[in-house]
């Protein structure tokens, strides 16, 4: 939907890392992973969340420290045949729980909520969620339903990012 969710996830991760926090950015959008592309990284294939969950790699091998950005990244992998099933796997929850012990912040980039169940599934592993909304894409009832889906999973909604707005008459900076 090009709402900018990956850009928000990457920039939040970068801001936290630049402020000295230990950050893990997880690309859980297994249908269209784009975190690495957004960071300008092309050499981490075979080091994704699916490799950890299916036991092909342990997390310390799959999670890569990106010196340039001072943060850790766990790549996505679009070759997974059933991303929803993989993200629902108990091992995914175990991995996130273990990662919470090692990192100050874990930022999880997911597919857009409402299109597939993946975002709502990942929300149950989080302490809070940020909902990225692109102007004029979804009607208000669909947005409210998506917020309900997120919070029913047990996550707190930290806030919303109203993104890619074209209306400059409402104020702002610049």
Question: Across the structure, where does each feature detected by a protein language model lie?
Answer:
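P-loop NTP-binding module
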Residues: 1-174
């Amino acid at each position: 939907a090009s709402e900018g969710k990956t850009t928000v996830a990457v920039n939040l991760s970068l801001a936290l890392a630049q402020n000295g926090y230990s950050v893990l950015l997880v690309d859980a959008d297994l249908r269209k992973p784009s975190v690495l592309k957004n960071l300008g990284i092309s050499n981490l294939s075979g080091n994704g969340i699916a490799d950890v969950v299916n036991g092909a790699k342990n997390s310390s091998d799959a999670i890569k420290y990106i010196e340039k950005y001072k943060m850790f990244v766990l790549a996505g992998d679009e070759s997974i045949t059933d991303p929803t099933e993989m993200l629902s796997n108990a091992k995914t929850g175990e991995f996130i729980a273990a990662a919470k012990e090692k990192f100050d912040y874990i930022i999880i980039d997911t597919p857009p909520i409402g299109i597939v169940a993946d975002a709502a599934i990942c929300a149950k592993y989080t302490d809070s969620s940020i909902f990225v909304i692109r102007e004029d894409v979804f009607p208000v009832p669909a947005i409210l339903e998506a917020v309900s889906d997120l919070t029913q999973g047990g996550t707190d909604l930290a806030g919303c990012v109203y993104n890619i707005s074209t209306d400059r008459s409402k104020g702002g900076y610049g």
